[in-house]
Design a protein with these regions (language model features):
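Conserved small/polar residues in nucleotide/adenosyl-binding loops
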Residues: 209-216
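N-terminal beta-strand-loop-alpha-helix module at the start
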Residues: 2-66
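Short, acidic/small-residue loops that bind anionic groups at enzyme active sites
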Residues: 139-158
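A glycine-rich helix N-cap at a beta->alpha junction
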Residues: 74-100
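Anionic-ligand binding region
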Residues: 161-172
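A charged, well-structured terminal subsegment
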Residues: 176-204
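Glycine-rich phosphate-binding loop signature in dinucleotide/nucleotide-binding domains
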Residues: 110-116
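Short Gly/Thr/Asp-enriched flexible loops that form oxyanion-binding sites at enzyme active sites
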Residues: 128-141
Length: 218
């Protein structure tokens, strides 16, 4: 049994180390003054995807990110850890997109990719803390969603079911859902594995697919 997994990932400014130049006069983040990193909870999500790849031979893990050209850096980071490929959704038309526009763009890109069992991403990005994009993507695709996930326990593709442990107030619960499905992962999930030196060498000249706004029009 093999799975097709799409990991939603975002490059974000590192708001954990905020200096005096981190904010603009209008109260927005000065992204140029902060280092860009792989959103932490998206790394937790990537680890869950890679564990499924380890468990189910033939499984592929594909990263999907939206942003300017430099956002391709997180595709490289994913490849260095064991992902198989990536799509960069980039266009001036996406500049300043809110969560509604972002989720629409991601959902239309996913429809174009059109080969997935699991769509997984972090619960929220540290530059917005909205936790809206994952659920909105699920809604736009008409898929079931499981949020606040800590661990994927089992996948039965023949039965079309997945079992997930998720965090709730005061404890955890185990839930099942149908495939395909959208899952968002908490920061309390297992941290992502480090880079693999052999993969770093392999993907020095990384190849990934650019998608523009007109290519995802539905």
């Amino acid at each position: 049994m093999s799975l097709r997994i799409i990991v939603l990932a975002k490059q974000v400014p590192d708001t954990r180390n905020v200096g005096k130049d981190a904010m603009k006069a209008d109260g927005t983040i000065n992204r140029a003054a902060l280092p860009a990193i792989f959103n932490p909870e998206d790394l937790n999500a990537l680890e869950q995807a890679l564990r499924l790849k380890d468990a189910y031979p033939g499984t592929t893990v594909t990263l999907l990110t939206m942003g300017p050209g430099r956002a391709a850096e997180i595709i490289r980071e994913g490849l260095y850890r064991g992902a198989d490929g990536g799509f960069l959704l980039t266009d001036r038309a996406f500049a300043g997109a809110d969560t509604l526009a972002t989720s629409y763009a991601l959902a239309t890109a996913i429809k174009k990719i059109n080969d997935y069992d699991i769509i997984i991403g972090g619960r929220q990005a540290i530059d917005g803390d909205t936790a809206q994009v994952g659920p909105q993507v699920a809604e736009k695709l008409g898929l079931t969603q499981i949020t606040y996930a800590e661990e994927i326990l089992n996948v039965d593709k023949e039965a079309g079911r997945i079992t997930v442990k998720r965090h709730i107030d005061g404890g955890v619960e185990t839930v099942e859902g149908p495939l395909p499905i959208v899952i968002t992962v908490n920061g309390s999930a297992a941290p992502c594995r480090p880079r693999n030196a052999k993969l770093v060498q392999k993907y020095k000249s990384v190849s990934y697919t650019h998608l523009r706004a007109h290519e995802t029009d539905q």
